[in-house]
Design a protein with these regions (language model features):
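Generic N-terminal amphipathic, Lys/Arg-enriched alpha-helix
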Residues: 3-22
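C-terminal accessory subdomain/extension
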Residues: 275-369
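Active-site loop/helix belt of alpha/beta enzymes
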Residues: 138, 145-257
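N-terminal glycine-rich anion-binding loops that anchor highly charged ligand groups
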Residues: 2-7, 26-58, 71-73
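Active-site-proximal beta-alpha core segment in soluble small-molecule metabolic enzymes
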Residues: 49-185
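Conserved, mostly hydrophobic/aromatic
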Residues: 27, 51, 81, 141, ...
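Active-site loop ensemble at the mouth of alpha/beta enzyme cores that anchors a bound cofactor
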Residues: 195, 227-302
Length: 369
């Protein structure tokens, strides 16, 4: 836990920097907004992704808000969430290798886990390990709907793999998943964006329909990221949405996906040098703030000509000379991309009304296996 625990209740200006902050009021409004769209309006399940959240305390907040479970990117993350009491977990990735598969099968005794597959080699390894352990593992087939990354091709290939899973005594075919966001990043025209999402998700739901026509039970049809969820959630055939990063909001989602959530995640820094009237140097660089796919955005300064991040410094050049902020003043940055920022820190500091209210350990940090 952070050494700043003694600062709870104090103004954030007294915190040592750099420090990762979440505005709790903005966070709670983002959560309520996503819950309303996904659960309230669309009537589907919400399984927020924790690849960017990384924090079990946040996961429990989302479960309390109505989420049915969580999505994890890696087995390590799933183990962290299960150890923290999260019970319904989808690992939206392929788990390969005998030691990892053995860990996965052991995890089934602690949580209701499902894992993605996109090939027969994975199916055979999972089935063998589950049977040897006397377990039964839920499996979802990942379908390539837009990303051209992992995923079996839609329709007939997806049905064939689903049948293979269903025929394994150590496995239970649970459904299908896909990610449509890769095909819509940067699309500005809302009609074009909707069409691209409908096409991608249609590949997933069509595959699910064909599985059912083949006599398979399909409980899960999972998709939807922060950049698409308000459209994907309302498309026929979708059963659950994986969007998670929207609870924080950031410059990337706003600029590249048109997500107008509040930017709740910020990095508080200290101005450590003013070498010229137009240059501001702060004590946080790319070891504290992600620089891709978007740079962080400084708050409360004049027009910025440029921003550069080195390992431990942020250097701003202003368009016009300005004596403020001065050395020792605090300067806050909106996270450029929350998924690439949270894992840089050990703790997340929840603030309300300018004061530190809570500190949450980012227990998923470094969990990449």
């Amino acid at each position: 836990m952070s050494a700043q625990t003694a600062m709870i209740g104090r103004p954030i200006a007294e915190l040592e920097t750099p420090v990762l902050l979440v505005d709790l009021d903005a966070f709670e409004r983002n959560v309520a907004r996503m819950r309303q769209v996904i659960i309230g309006e669309a009537g589907v399940g919400w399984r927020p992704h924790t690849k960017g959240i990384k924090t079990p305390a946040i996961a429990h907040k989302l479960l309390q808000a109505g989420a049915l479970g969580v999505t994890c990117a890696k087995l390590d993350e799933a183990e962290v969430m299960a150890a923290a009491g999260v019970r319904d977990i989808l690992i939206a990735n392929e788990v390969v290798g005998s030691s990892k598969v053995a860990r996965l099968v052991r995890l089934v005794h602690h949580a209701d886990v499902a894992v993605a597959v996109d090939g027969e080699e994975q199916v055979e390894a999972l089935d063998r390990a589950a049977r040897d352990a006397g377990s039964r593992l839920r499996v979802v087939v990942e379908v390539n709907v837009a990303m051209n990354r992992a995923g079996v091709e839609p329709c007939d290939p997806a049905v064939a793999l689903a049948r293979r899973v269903a025929g394994c005594s150590g496995l239970r075919f649970a459904g299908l998943m896909g990610w449509e966001g890769g095909g819509v990043a940067g699309l500005r025209d809302p009609v074009e964006k909707r069409r691209a999402i409908e096409t991608a998700v249609g590949r997933l739901t069509d595959s699910a329909d064909r599985c059912r026509a083949a006599g398979l039970s399909v409980d899960i049809v999972s998709c939807g990221g922060t950049g698409t969820y308000w459209i994907s959630a309302k498309l026929p055939g979708v059963t659950e949405i994986q969007a998670g990063g929207g609870v924080f909001g950031d410059a990337h989602y706003r600029t590249n996906y048109g997500v107008d959530h509040e930017c709740a995640l910020t990095i508080l820094t200290t101005v450590i040098s003013r070498p010229t009237p137009t240059r501001i140097v702060c004590d946080a660089g790319w070891k504290s703030m992600a620089r891709v796919p978007m740079l962080p955005e400084p708050l409360g300064v004049g027009e910025v000509k440029s921003l550069g991040l080195s390992a431990e410094h942020a250097t701003l050049e202003l368009v016009r000379p300005d004596p403020a902020p001065r050395v020792g003043d605090r300067l806050e940055f909106v996270a450029g991309y929350s998924d690439a920022t949270v894992f840089l820190h050990d703790d997340l500091h929840g603030v309300r009304g300018g004061r530190l209210e809570v500190i949450w350990s980012i227990l998923g940090r470094g969990k990449t296996r």
